C-alpha cells in the first residue's frame, strides 16, 4: 500500500521546486509600474465626457432608461469629488467613484455601481494615456478626444 502511494506522490513532489538564488533578476525583483495619472486632463471637460459616455454606453448596452442620465451625472460628480480630494491616479479615482456610487445607486439600473466605476477608469486611462484594453466598452482615445473637443477643450 505504501509503495502504491509513493508511486503517486513521488512525481508530484518534483513539481514543487524551492526558489533558487540563481533565478533571473526579473523574477526576484518586484515589478514597479507607474500609476496612470489624470493631472494633464481638464477636470470639468473630463467630467462632462464621463457623464455623456457612460450614459450613452448604458443606453447602447441595455435599453434607454432615465436612470442612465442620473448614473452618468453621479459618476461625473464622484470624479470631480475625487479630484477635489487631491486624488490623481486612476486606481484611487476608481476606488473613490465606486464607493461614492454605492451610496446612492438607482435600483432600476441593469448594472451595478462598480461596473460604472470600471467604465470611468477605462475612460480615464484612454484619455490620460491613449491606451485602451480591448475588452473595454469605453470608446477609443480618439473618440474620447473628439467628444472632449465638443465640450470645448482638449484633454491632453
What are the roles of these predicted feature ranges?
Residues 16-156:
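N-terminal plastid-targeting presequences
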Residues 1-24:
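N-terminal chloroplast transit peptides
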